[in-house]
């Protein structure tokens, strides 16, 4: 995990530890040499230095090794949003246009309709509709409760967390058996994505 915003030390010109160019995370800056210089040369290949924690290997590993940054708030990865097909819109079974409206803070989305008679989960609301709903909820004579509305990547995260992928996969298989034509093709596409997520065990 990258925990510091530093890149290179201006005096030593070496990458800062735990920074954006960290050798412990991404690999050595020089071939077959650890950060502190205890191990140099090919004969120490594969050794992890006990002082600095850097693996003695080729510097080219830095081109493909990846670290991660813990963000203060959720963000939507553009590959899963804009890629073809858009995995987020397929998983949520929502049109890509609607998903983009939520991500770019143009529309609110209903996360939980509570006991509201007209709201549905995943229904989009404009800012005016959202404010109107807020007024209804906080009115003195209101009986509305349990209603949740969100916007941005945080709302998408919540919708994705609420998915029951195994149950969805079973339901999709049943629907595919009776569906035909374009609808069947769409269901198969969604089932493929759901099955892939279930197979990774990351749900």
Swiss-Prot record:
Reported cofactor(s): Zn(2+)
Keywords, alphabetical: DNA-directed RNA polymerase, Metal-binding, Nucleotidyltransferase, Transcription, Transferase, Zinc
SUPFAM superfamilies in UniProt: beta and beta-prime subunits of DNA dependent RNA-polymerase
Disulfide bonds: none
Molecular function GO labels: DNA binding; DNA-directed RNA polymerase activity; metal ion binding
Function summary: DNA-dependent RNA polymerase catalyzes the transcription of DNA into RNA using the four ribonucleoside triphosphates as substrates.
GO terms, biological process: DNA-templated transcription
Enzyme Commission code(s) on record: 2.7.7.6
Gene Ontology CC terms: DNA-directed RNA polymerase complex
Pfam families for this protein: RNA_pol_Rpb1_1 (PF04997)
Note on cofactor: Binds 1 Zn(2+) ion per subunit.
Protein name as it appears in the record: DNA-directed RNA polymerase subunit gamma
PANTHER family referenced in this protein's UniProt entry, alphabetically: DNA-DIRECTED RNA POLYMERASE, DNA-DIRECTED RNA POLYMERASE SUBUNIT BETA
UniProt similarity note: Belongs to the RNA polymerase beta' chain family. RpoC1 subfamily.
Residues that, per the record, bind Zn(2+): 34, 36, 49, 52
Subunit structure, interactors included: In cyanobacteria the RNAP catalytic core is composed of 2 alpha, 1 beta, 1 beta', 1 gamma and 1 omega subunit. When a sigma factor is associated with the core the holoenzyme is formed, which can initiate transcription.
Reactions catalysed according to its record: RNA(n) + a ribonucleoside 5'-triphosphate = RNA(n+1) + diphosphate
Organism (species): Prochlorothrix hollandica
């Amino acid at each position: 995990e990258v925990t510091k915003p530093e890149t290179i030390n201006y005096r030593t010109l070496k990458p800062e530890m735990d920074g954006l160019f960290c050798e412990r995370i991404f690999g050595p800056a020089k071939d077959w040499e650890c950060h502190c210089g205890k191990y140099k040369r090919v004969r120490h290949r594969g050794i992890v230095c006990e002082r600095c924690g850097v693996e003695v290997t080729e510097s080219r590993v830095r081109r493909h090794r990846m670290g991660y940054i813990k963000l203060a708030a959720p963000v939507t990865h553009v590959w899963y949003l804009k890629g073809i097909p858009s995995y987020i819109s397929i998983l949520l079974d929502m049109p890509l246009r609607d998903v983009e409206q939520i991500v770019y803070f143009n529309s609110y989305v209903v996360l939980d309709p509570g006991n509201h008679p007209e709201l549905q989960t995943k229904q989009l609301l404009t800012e005016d509709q959202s404010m109107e709903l807020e007024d209804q909820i906080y009115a003195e004579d209101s009986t509305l409760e349990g209603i949740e509305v969100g916007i941005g990547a945080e709302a998408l995260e919540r919708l994705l967390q609420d998915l029951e992928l195994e149950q969805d996969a079973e339901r999709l298989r049943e629907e595919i058996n009776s569906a035909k034509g374009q609808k069947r093709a769409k269901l198969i596409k969604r089932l493929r994505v759901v099955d892939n997520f279930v197979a990774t065990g990351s749900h």
